Amino acid sequence: MSPLIYYAHSAQDKLGNLLPYKHWQTLQSHLVNVGEMAAEFAQVFGAQEIACQTGQLHDLGKYSEAFDRRLHGGSSVDHATAGAKIAVERWGNVIGKLMAFCIAGHHAGLANGCGEGDNRSTLKQRLALQFDEDIPALYNLWQQEIKL
């Protein structure tokens, strides 16, 4: 069963103890805010809409049980590949892959498209990962909270 509220970031006190949920940032607010900021930055070159959607997809993998466990001290989770996969599914192999490079690399930096990299997976390898096998399955609520 999925939680009613998804969170992007937890909050801790000075001793590292988790603070109550009211101090945490909701995932919906985080994705909307990042989308808005990305659109502002992209205005200078006229790509506001695609930048907004890229920003909204960058942490889509946080809509998962595995990431909820991460927020409570569990192991790290690939939360970027899900958004990269959705971008390619929705916008295809040109715009979608440009978005996917940004989304998949938002922590580790841009990956190679398909050639060997510096101990990082390529975008091609990441896009081949399967939901609920290689990366966490997404809760469907993301489609109601994030309007693409």
Annotate each PLM feature:
Residues 1-148:
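Accessory nucleic-acid engagement/destabilization modules that flank
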